A protein has these predicted regions:
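Mixed-charge (Asp/Glu-Lys/Arg
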Residues: 1-149
Length: 149
C-alpha cells in the first residue's frame, strides 16, 4: 500500500535511469525505510539474509513482513544472477527469511532469469508468498513520487 499512489505507468527514458548511477545503495535504502515508516536500519555485511527487514508493509490493508535485497550503482548494468552475491545466492538467502513478501530492487533493469529465480523461490510449495521486482525505472518513480531525488 505504501506505493499505491506511485504512477508506475509514467514514461521514463534511459537518460532518466542515469540519475540512479549517482544514488548510492545506502541512500535508496534510507529512502525506502523512510517511505515504509521503518525506524530500524540494518547494518550491511556480506552474508546478510536481506538489506531491509520490515513488518510495516501493508497489502490491501493487512500488515505483512517483507525482506528486501537491494543492488546499487556499483553494478550499474542489467541485473543478472551473478550480481546477486558472491555465489549468486542472495535470493536464496532472502527466501530463507520468514517474510510474506520478497523484494529485489536494482538501480537498472533486471534480467528475466533473476525474476524467474525470485518467482521460483517465492512460489515454493509449502511456503508460497508474494514477490516484487523493483527495477531502476520503478525505483526512480518511487523516489521521485516521495521527493527523494
Amino acid at each position: 500500500d505504501a506505493f499505491k499512489d506511485v504512477d508506475f505507468t509514467a514514461r521514463l527514458t534511459k537518460k532518466d535511469l542515469e540519475i540512479l548511477r549517482d544514488v548510492p545503495e545506502e541512500a535508496v535504502k534510507l529512502a525506502l525505510l523512510d517511505i515504509l515508516g521503518e525506524p530500524e536500519v540494518q547494518k550491511d555485511w556480506g552474508g546478510e539474509q536481506c538489506d531491509i527487514w520490515t513488518d510495516r508493509i501493508t497489502i490491501d490493508g493487512g500488515r505483512h513482513q517483507a525482506a528486501f535485497a537491494l543492488k546499487g550503482p556499483a553494478k550499474f548494468h542489467p541485473m543478472t544472477v551473478s550480481d546477486l552475491g558472491k555465489n549468486g545466492d542472495q535470493i536464496a538467502r532472502l527466501a530463507h527469511t520468514a517474510a510474506d513478501l520478497l523484494v529485489v530492487q536494482h538501480c537498472h533493469t533486471v534480467k528475466a532469469e533473476v525474476v524467474e529465480m525470485l518467482r521460483t523461490y517465492a512460489l515454493r510449495p509449502g511456503h508460497v508468498r508474494r514477490y516484487m521486482v523493483l527495477n531502476g525505472y520503478d525505483t526512480l518513480r518511487i523516489l521521485r513520487h516521495f521527493g527523494k531525488v
